[in-house]
């Protein structure tokens, strides 16, 4: 059985009942909003793009926000912004912890919905709030983003901000991942529990990727010699554990503890 099959066979552990309820609620409420803003993780934009959310919200104007851009490579983020733009999708990069993000996001929404706002003005609906559904997978910073708006809470899910009504939806995943890469990426950022995968194998996969893209940063972070880059991934994990003093009796490296670091 492949790792992807193992992950999907354990879906009950990472797709609890409340996520099913969230998808049903989304299907019910989508007709009551003017726009959908999906929060993605700037480090893994495609892996954090939920196909179930895409399916449910397909009929509404759709915007994306690449959150946690402070943790991503800025040059790669520029490429992702260009990618979304080429696909005709409104998109911004942001750090939801940074002050002033709410203003930039509101500007994007207003730009995307300019035609709708003009129609409303022509009909005398000047005071009508724009209703925006905020969606995303767990742990992409959606709550921090919502809290960046100095708004007034109306009920359990609605927040009023200036000319906007924001509908905050709980983070939700989808039932089956199409690849091990997607599942691994989601585990890396904490969107699914990392114990669904073998933690040491997961860490080795991450080290292998980082070593290929950012070798010097890897060496600097763990104070390793250049020779470490030639090691097999598991040996590299052991070298990092040894540097950090993560040893067990007999002087062996505690690779499980190192992998969780």
Where are the model-predicted features located?
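Helix-rich effector regions associated with P-loop NTPase G domains
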Residues: 1-35, 43-51, 56-62, 69, ...
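Canonical P-loop GTPase G-domain recognition
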Residues: 69-135
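Short, well-ordered alpha-helical segments in soluble proteins
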Residues: 109-120, 138, 149-153, 173, ...
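Glycine-rich phosphate-binding P-loop
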Residues: 131-154, 169
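Conserved active-site beta-strand-loop modules that form the wall/rim of enzyme catalytic pockets
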Residues: 96, 143-146, 164-165
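Intrinsically disordered, low-complexity regulatory regions enriched in Ser/Pro/Gly/Thr
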Residues: 29-30, 85, 138
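Structural beta-sheet core signal
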Residues: 38, 64-66, 134
């Amino acid at each position: 059985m492949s790792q992807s099959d193992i992950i999907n066979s354990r879906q009950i552990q990472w797709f609890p009942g409340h996520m099913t309820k969230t998808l049903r609620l989304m299907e019910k409420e989508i007709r009551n909003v003017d726009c959908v803003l999906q929060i993605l993780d700037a480090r893994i934009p495609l892996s954090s793009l939920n196909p179930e959310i895409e399916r449910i919200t397909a009929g509404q104007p759709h915007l994306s926000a690449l959150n946690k851009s402070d943790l991503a490579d800025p040059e790669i983020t520029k490429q992702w912004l260009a990618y979304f733009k080429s696909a005709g999708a409104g998109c911004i990069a942001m750090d939801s912890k940074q002050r002033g993000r709410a203003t930039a996001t509101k500007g994007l929404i207003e730009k995307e919905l300019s035609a709708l706002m003009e129609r409303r003005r022509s009909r005398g609906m000047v005071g009508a709030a724009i209703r925006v559904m905020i969606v995303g997978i767990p742990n992409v910073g959606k709550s921090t983003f919502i809290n960046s708006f100095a708004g007034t809470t109306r009920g359990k899910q609605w927040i009023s901000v200036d000319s906007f009504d924001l509908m905050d939806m709980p983070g939700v995943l989808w039932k089956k991942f199409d690849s091990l890469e997607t599942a691994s990426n989601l585990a890396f950022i904490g969107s699914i529990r990392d114990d669904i995968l073998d933690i040491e194998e997961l860490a080795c996969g991450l080290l292998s990727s980082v070593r290929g893209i950012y070798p010097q940063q890897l060496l600097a972070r763990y104070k390793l010699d250049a020779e470490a880059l030639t090691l097999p991934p598991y040996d590299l994990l052991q070298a990092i554990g040894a540097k950090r003093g993560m040893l067990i009796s007999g002087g062996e490296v505690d690779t499980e503890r190192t992998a969780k670091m």
